[in-house]
Design a protein with these regions (language model features):
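Accessible peptide chain termini
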Residues: 1-2, 15
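Short hydrophobic targeting helices and cationic amphipathic motifs
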Residues: 3, 7-9
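Residues lining hydrophobic/aromatic ligand-binding pockets adjacent to catalytic sites
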Residues: 9-137
């Protein structure tokens, strides 16, 4: 599990909440807090009622064309990462997504949920880096 720590300031003092990254098939824990699915497709074989997803952020996942080109081997990971980063930069819905994250971090942890068996070779590292930059890690 990957963690990003944020300090959310409250009137009574500082509270520390985290953005976590977790595979959809991992055990759900109380510390997960608000769970956001960051994949375009629903995780195979996972029932919606078992996933405990609070928000499905299809809007920030790689486009269908980009995802398919990468999975078919038409483009390599480096090219995929560059193109996905560009999609994120041009995504007018990212601000809404960012707002949801910030609002939920005021209440507790946020867990980004994904299906990939190899997250290091998926869109996850690109999205993680982009979120860190936008939220000012």
């Amino acid at each position: 599990m990957i963690l990003i720590r944020f300090l959310i300031l409250e009137k009574e003092g500082a509270m520390k909440f985290e953005i976590k990254w977790k595979r959809a098939y991992e055990k759900i824990g109380e510390a997960d807090g608000f769970r956001i699915l960051v994949d375009k497709l629903w995780p195979r074989g996972l029932k919606k009622e078992d996933a405990k997803i609070d928000y499905w952020a299809k809007i920030i996942a790689p486009s269908k064309e980009l995802r398919q080109n990468y999975h078919k081997g038409i483009i390599d990971f480096e090219n995929f990462s560059e193109k996905y980063r560009k999609e994120l930069e041009e995504n007018s819905d990212f601000e809404e997504f960012e707002g949801i994250i910030l609002e939920e971090l005021k209440k507790g942890n946020v867990t980004m949920v994904y299906a990939s068996k190899t997250p290091e070779l998926s869109h996850i590292p690109v999205l993680k880096e982009f979120i860190e930059e936008k939220l000012g890690k």
